[in-house]
Amino acid sequence: MDPSIFKLLEEDEDESMHSGADVDAFQAALNRDIEGSMTTSIPHVTNPGNNHSSRQQFSTWKNGIGDSNINVQTQHSLESTQMKEQEGSTLENQHQHDLKRANEPHLQHNQPQDLHRAGQLWENPSQVPQSTGLPISEKNPTGNESDRSHNQESESQYMKLQKMSSQQARGVEPPVNPMNVNPINRNPKQVPFAALLPTLMNQLDKDRALQLRTLYARLKKNEIPKEGFTRHMKDIVGDQMLRMAVSKLQQVNYNQGKIGIQAPSTEINNQKSQSDPRAVHLNQLPSSASGTLGSSVPVQGLTKHPQHQMQHPPSSFPMYTTSGSFHSFPGPNTNASGSTLRPHLHDSHMRHVAHNQPMGSTGLGGPPQSTTNMMTMPKFERPSSVNDPSRVQGGATSHFQNSSSLPLNSAPGQGSSVSHVKQESVDQSFEKNNAASMTSNEDLEKESSRMVLSTPNNMAPASSVSPSMTTQLDASTTMNSRGPLGTSQGGANARMPPKKPSVGQKKPLETLGSSPPPPSKKQKVAGNSMDQSIEQLNDVTAVSGVNLREEEEQLFSGAKEDGRVSEASRRVVHEEEERLILQKNPLQRKLAEIMAKAGLKQISNDVERCLSLCVEERMRGLLSHIIRLSKQRVDAEKSRHRTFITSDIRLQINEMNQKVKEEWEKKQAEAEKLKKPSESEEGDGGVDSEKDKEDNRSKGVKGNKEDDDKMRTTAANVAARAAVGGDDAFLKWQLMAEARQKSVSEAGKDGNQKTTSGGGKNSKDRQDGGRRFSGTESSCGVGIVYRVSSSRFWFAMMSFGFLFAGGRRVGKNQGSSLQPKVVRTISVKDVVAVLEREPQMSKSTLMYRLIQ
């Protein structure tokens, strides 16, 4: 890495920490020392002519409290450091300035020499400090008698003003001002890491900014050396961006160093601004560059939370002006609790004639300059009530008066002005209720580091200076003169339009030395803006063709119609509510009885309606449960549970068997009757009887075969019909019985004929054949009832099985079709079943009455 960049990034850091108890103890001791030193040393400085004694008193007092100043600075630096770490990397610049304050003890001992040499820093830019603050005590072996005499006079004026400031400040409050000293670098070319870090953060994305912030935290904890931090930062940021940021900071610090030389305050306050945030401090500082007075009234005006009050030195917004420069330094914001503090400065103590010195004639080459010394105050106005004039006024308290004009450095058209400074009485009262969120600490910090109003090369006359105070001014921004250079006229009043550093609000112009504006001005402006916005809105509606009156009428008419509809619906609901399930008179009588028993005197009208609705809801629930349980109840007396008989197979079989038996008995009786006459005729023809027997046998066999075939065919047809779903089984059995009767009658006829022609043996054979036929007949007709050892039994079983199955199916279908729909009824059994399942009714007397 380039060694020049490395040198630019070097800085000295003080990481020393102190506990809170040590700081408080030191604070108390410091307060006692300050009170004693101020009472003993300051009253002696009363004679402006006694330069030697005042010089000794000043140096003695400065040396006595020098160490205390350093400790106070360290204390506030530590407080600022803690708050900076919470706020983030954007406030690192101020944090580093506060830390380096303890490293410059030698700047606070040789104060008169520094004040004397502050005017020479304009001619030597290499000795200009890099940050606005205390002048650097550079070693300068050369000097002249005029400078010394000027130094003595400025010292006497300085001590005189200190005495006056201390007397008035004690009436207000012991101020806290730990030496308004900004940290400076030992080498003007060096750039601190803390000042460089916010500039780089704004140009990086989130990831790289986070990496850089983490790297800086490690550097603060001494985890990595400065060389390693520089190397890693170059890797993250890049060489080109780093060079640009460093050059920009150098330019900014150079400009601020040229115009920001100021004398430190010599008062050390006995209380911190944290303990009493309602203080108004008066610090009057000499301007040593031109010999004129630059007085500042620090205003602590903007209320912040206590944790935000450690970020700045206790003196807030003093503006120190030397060689025509304007510089502001922010401090913690406090709130004066409604009290108006008015430090009145006498005019005789504030009027001094500036010593004009031809700086170009001393041989120190430099640009021609026109110095204008001003006493200004930043102006921060808070919103207040209409009749409340309690607002902080500042900024317009400088009155410029030129008593002479001398050319500087033999440059025509340029001159120096003699300033006459008069500080007007300023009302500094704040309302705590009106001090909410006006500015942020970032705004105040930016204002302290970026508010530059003019440069030595381009100076305007006092009458043409019009700086603007905003929080967005860059550090390198300067105010160029708007008119030609020239000498200012005596008694000319410079107009300064300071603006409030709050975002989005502007302040009206004010003339220096004028009285504060009326408090109702802002409200008037706000009212005018509101009226203007309403008028603009009306204009927009008119241009767009919207008639507001018609729209309003439509809206109101729609509301009326809605009201009518809602009224009708309310009326209907009311009528429905009036139709209660319980009658009013019986209900009122019952309620009266209950009230008499319970000892009630009065009952509301809504009770009747509520009871009626409750009864209705209870009955609805009971009925739904009763209907559900009635479907599950099974009663024998119900008609829907009765069975309808469509066909009785057993009865039909018994009837058929009975008929067969009767027929068989008749045949037997007829056969016996015929047997008796045949026995008498047996002896007549033996050969004929044998032939007849054989013929009868052959005919009987043939007849039986035919009958069997017929029966098989009919049974098969009946079974097929039953399988398909044909006629009733009763008809089928009837057909089969008729067929059997026919076959039996035919067989009987044939047998009778044979018996009449045949002998006694033929009659026995016919009897056997009749028995055999009757047996087969009964087996075919009865089936399951009679078991016959025959090959046709299994076929009959199969056929009858089909018949039985078909009969069952037909019977079921007929039963379902003939079954009527039963009308459901609710009986006491259903009510009892429902109440038994309810816990609150299962053991009530109503259950016993229902069961009985």
Swiss-Prot record:
It is found in: Nucleus. Expressed in roots, leaves and inflorescences. One of its GO terms (biological process) is transcription by RNA polymerase II. Residues 662-679, 688-712, 742-752, 762-771 have a biased composition (Basic and acidic residues). It comes from the Eukaryota. GO terms for molecular function: protein heterodimerization activity. Residues 184-255 form the RST domain. Residues 41-100, 124-166, 284-315, 354-528, 662-712, 742-777 are annotated as: Disordered. Residues 41-81, 124-144, 154-166, 284-298, 384-441, 451-491 have a biased composition (Polar residues). GO terms for cellular component: transcription factor TFIID complex. Its main location: nucleus. Keywords: Activator, Nucleus, Transcription, Transcription regulation. The keyword Metal-binding does not apply. InterPro entries: Histone-fold, RST, TAF4, TAF4_C. TAFs are components of the transcription factor IID (TFIID) complex that is essential for mediating regulation of RNA polymerase transcription. Belongs to the TAF4 family. Component of the TFIID complex. TFIID is composed of TATA binding protein (TBP) and a number of TBP-associated factors (TAFs) whose MWs range from 14-217 kDa. Can homodimerize. Interacts with TAF5, TAF8, TAF9, TAF10, TAF12, TAF12B, TAF13 TAF14, TAF14B, TAF15 and TAF15B. This is Transcription initiation factor TFIID subunit 4b. It comes from Arabidopsis thaliana (Mouse-ear cress). The lineage of its organism: Eukaryota, Viridiplantae, Streptophyta, Embryophyta, Tracheophyta. The gene is TAF4B.
